[in-house]
């Protein structure tokens, strides 16, 4: 069970609430602190929320009214710090993917006058930063989907420069500019990076 309260002020959490990520006698929380408390049963989760609620009230703080909830992650998912959690699985939440795509769209407009090399270098900076945080997804399909979508964007840009029109989703565009074409030009692959990260974690 997850009880996910959010604290909305600077505070100090004592061992009265058993938050085990700190071994000191207290924990300093910055403004709008978010935390997840894992419990073995619904009853313990409700009790944990009650303890936290009493503690924050005693210290002049408040829990966020809509983001504080008790969730059984075995049957329902919940969002936390950009990820979606369900049981033992976790992946970038929909909003996180939308934000990344929005940033990449602005960098890969078909009307861009920048060279492909410059665009790829610019895109790579965004991809590496995003992957640094979101490399822990248990769904590898997330990375494959983003890689495919980005190559489609770049093919559409190249097709326009070659005098063509429309979004390059057809086989002709994939044949003209295959995946290897972009790899040879240094396009960062989320799929490849995730595979390497998984290999490293198994060592």
Question: Where are the predicted features?
Answer:
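Non-catalytic terminal/accessory segments
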Residues: 1-203
